[in-house]
């Protein structure tokens, strides 16, 4: 085995937003650099600068290639493809140059645009893919609205990914369910996301507040949550719901009007860095997602002593929540039962406390020290 102070390069689109992948990459990069003493570089393609939304150690270097694939989102399909191929060619050239310059021991990709060519870069590094989405949502296209040629293109593209994943030295997924999603692959390892908080206290569970944290998107299910809350607020007239999320809340404001939801007790906020503070000011965490690669928000809330309610969607929640023990799992997408579970927790401080204590114990499995050790063992194994 080589000197175990490895050079690690992370390839991920961006660090500037408040997404789960950005949070996890930042936490692990900090641990690898500050605790394990690795030489860590993160290479991004998006954002005007390399600034991270989440805290990033001074020991972690960031290289921004400035390709800005995100500017293609509003282009027509044909123009998008032509410009994408041009940017992709430049990305391959720039990333190859950086990897040949850095000569990392290990290159980790979050399986975005570089997965199409990263195995062909002969820089001598081991290549690890890190999958943060369920298979059904990896490179998903909404077939309800897409033209037939777009559907064909994306399905063809998606199938080609399997070959690229097979060539990786290792593919890391977040749950055991996710392992079973990829029967074609024999190079899989399960390592969960790490808890990103250093929690020093626990919620008193006395505030009359339900909280959720995520992204204003279809996958996160806030349209469903508002329908659920329209039931809850009628029975629990002194409780409030606070949603902290990145993205545009405008469609949800309209939905609140349509459902006659009391805006004095249901608040749509932008994303926050200090999520621990919001957990500690709350008494229940809800996660109404249609799909989750893992469910880091659940672990964070549990670490702060909150009972949690989540749909039993693929893939993450069932690996974290034991229904009726440290939280509630609700069959997708049973709005009435979800509302009843919230009301049940609102009605009993003892139940909130019992579930919160069990959840807090469960969250210890995801401490960065534990997860980081699993990554270290993987690195050592690959570098033998």
Predicted regions and their residues:
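Short hydrophobic beta-strand element within catalytic cores of glycosyltransferases
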Residues: 307-311
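Glycosyltransferase donor-sugar binding loop
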Residues: 42-50, 213, 240-253
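Carbohydrate-associated surface elements
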Residues: 177, 194
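Membrane-proximal helix-turn-helix segments that form the acceptor-binding/catalytic region
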Residues: 93-98, 135, 150-170
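A conserved mid-protein helix/loop that constitutes part of the nucleotide-sugar donor-binding site
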Residues: 19-27, 208, 212-231, 250, ...
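Active-site proximal beta-strand in glycosyltransferases
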Residues: 106-108, 121-141, 151, 172
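Aromatic "clamp/platform" in nucleotide-sugar-dependent glycosyltransferases that forms part
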Residues: 271, 290
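Conserved acidic donor-binding segment of nucleotide-sugar-dependent glycosyltransferases
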Residues: 322-324, 328-335, 344-350, 364
């Amino acid at each position: 085995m080589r000197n175990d102070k490895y050079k690690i390069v992370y390839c991920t689109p961006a660090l500037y937003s408040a997404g789960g992948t950005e949070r996890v990459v930042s936490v692990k990069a900090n641990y690898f650099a500050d605790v394990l003493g690795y030489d860590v570089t993160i290479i991004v393609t998006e954002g005007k600068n390399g600034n991270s939304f989440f805290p990033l150690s001074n020991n972690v270097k960031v290289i921004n290639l400035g390709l800005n694939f995100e500017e293609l989102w509003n282009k027509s399909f044909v123009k998008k493809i032509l410009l994408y191929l041009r940017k992709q060619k430049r990305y391959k050239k720039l990333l190859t140059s950086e990897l040949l310059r850095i000569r990392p021991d290990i290159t980790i990709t979050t399986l975005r645009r570089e997965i199409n060519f990263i195995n062909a870069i002969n820089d001598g590094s081991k290549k690890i893919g890190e999958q943060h989405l369920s298979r059904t949502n990896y490179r998903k296209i909404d077939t309800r609205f897409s033209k037939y040629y777009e559907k064909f293109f994306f399905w063809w593209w998606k199938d080609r990914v399997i070959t690229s994943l097979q060539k990786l030295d290792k593919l890391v997924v977040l749950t055991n369910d996710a392992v079973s999603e990829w029967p074609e692959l024999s190079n899989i390892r399960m390592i969960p996301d790490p808890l990103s908080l250093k929690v020093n206290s626990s919620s008193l569970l006395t505030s009359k507040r339900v909280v959720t944290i995520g992204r204003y998107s279809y996958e996160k299910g806030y349209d469903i949550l508002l329908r659920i809350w329209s039931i809850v607020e009628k029975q629990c007239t002194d409780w409030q719901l606070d949603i902290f999320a990145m993205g545009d809340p405008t469609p949800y404001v309209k939905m609140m009007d349509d459902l006659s939801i009391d805006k004095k007790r249901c608040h749509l906020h932008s994303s926050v860095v200090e999520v621990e503070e919001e957990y500690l000011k709350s008494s229940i965490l809800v996660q109404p997602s249609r799909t989750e690669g893992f469910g880091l928000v659940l672990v964070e809330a549990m670490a702060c002593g909150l009972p949690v309610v989540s749909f039993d969607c693929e893939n993450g929640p069932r690996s974290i929540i034991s229904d009726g023990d440290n939280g509630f799992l609700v069959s997708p997408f049973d709005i009435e039962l979800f509302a009843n579970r919230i009301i049940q927790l609102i009605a009993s401080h003892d139940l909130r406390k019992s579930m919160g204590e069990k959840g807090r114990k469960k969250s210890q499995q995801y401490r960065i020290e534990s997860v980081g050790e699993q990554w270290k063992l993987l690195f050592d194994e690959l570098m033998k």
